[in-house]
């Protein structure tokens, strides 16, 4: 479902998110979505290959999407966790596995390597 607004940043939720990203400048944006059951990634850095049982499967970057804005235009990595179902959360053990994998990836890619283009510490 892609229901774009009438113009870029015309929707209040988009305006809010844009302001937060512009002010805070996060090192990583994590988006939770459904229903593809994959891991998506946009932006700099080598992407995580998996989070829990979700495997990397880049679904593409769409103009106006969070991945396009954050990952392509702003250079902020965007990890999108695509759950299997919008109304059914994974079990606690699976959620823990996803977060553990994400934290390991962040430690290597964001903390040790630093921003893209910088030398490793």
Regions found by a protein language model. Name each.
Residues 1-60, 68, 90:
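Active-site/substrate-binding loop(s) of hydrolase catalytic cores
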Residues 39-42, 48-50, 60-120:
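Active-site-adjacent mobile loop/cap segments within catalytic or ligand-binding domains
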């Amino acid at each position: 479902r892609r229901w774009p607004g009438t113009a870029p940043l015309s929707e209040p939720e988009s305006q809010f998110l844009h302001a937060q990203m512009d002010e805070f400048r996060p090192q990583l944006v994590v988006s939770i979505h459904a229903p593809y059951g994959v891991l998506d990634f946009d932006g700099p850095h080598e992407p995580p290959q998996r989070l829990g049982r979700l495997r990397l499967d880049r679904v593409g970057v769409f103009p106006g999407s969070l991945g396009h804005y954050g990952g392509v235009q702003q250079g902020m990595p965007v990890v999108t966790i695509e759950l299997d179902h919008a109304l059914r959360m994974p079990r606690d053990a699976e959620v823990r596995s996803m977060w553990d994998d994400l934290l390991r990836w962040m430690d290597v890619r964001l903390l040790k390597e630093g921003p893209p283009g910088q030398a490793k510490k």
